[in-house]
Amino acid sequence: MLLAAIDIGTVTARLALAQVEDGRVIRMAKYTEIVNLGEGVDKTKRLLPEAIHRCVGCVSSYVDHARKEGAEAVVCTLTSAARDAENAPDLGMGLASLGLEPMIIPGEIEGALTFLGVSHDFENHRILVADSGGGSTELVVGTLVGQAAAQVTGQQPGGQQLDINFVESVDLGCRRLTERFNLSLDHPSAEDIDGAHQMAAQMMSEAIGRAQQQCAAPELLVGVGGTATSLIAVRDRLNPYDPAKVHLNHISIDEVSQIEGLLASKTLKEREDITGLQVKRAPV
């Protein structure tokens, strides 16, 4: 059975085509396009007409492709920008005209779904997954208990158990911070950069504090999303982008700081020319 899933975030819209047999994904093809649906939403709480147009156009091409490939079902979910926007129903009508039943999912569901996908690479390890998007960051702590621990957990041999201990969605993302602190300008000011740092540090510290009250400390921090993958791509100067070289890679705090300094020192045009950074990501 071929299934299609469309995920519409604040910055990107994604399509996954998955061949599923006996409840398992056998093959998957992924497609990503930057549509910037959340442009201006942090300030106005409304989706721009041109952003809706970009998004519906992208999704229309995704639906056409999925149906040509023989997808038996197409699921469409929307996240942070749609959650925040008062006129999200306008977008919903456009998507419904394509034959979809779009669902705006809560941040906690978004986080749990992300964790489900990520945890298969870290079976039997307690991990903290941070899915940093354009408008929000989902933090999830938990463990995918695999067959090696079946006797301990009382599962049937070969079974798996998803044990999520903490999940929270924080209104903190690259587009939200960029727009609130004018970070898309050429050479953003030290004051604006410091303001973004303080906001991020406070919100993340509070969320991590709540996690510490609810569960044991994780073994690993796993970064997910376009911000995390872009950091690796810029550091390693990937051109063209190669997901195989990004997946399960590592990056240090010092390296993140160096890349931040590099981006802050450049004009928008210069950021567009940085090897490894998608041109449409340069403004955020």
Positions of predicted regions on the chain:
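A short acidic Gly-Thr/Ser loop motif
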Residues: 7-12, 130-136, 144, 224-227
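N-terminal basic/disordered segments at the start of proteins
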Residues: 1-27
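N-terminal glycine-rich anion-binding loops that anchor highly charged ligand groups
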Residues: 24-39
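Helical "lid/coupling" subdomains associated with nucleotide-phosphate turnover
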Residues: 3, 17-20, 36, 40-69, ...
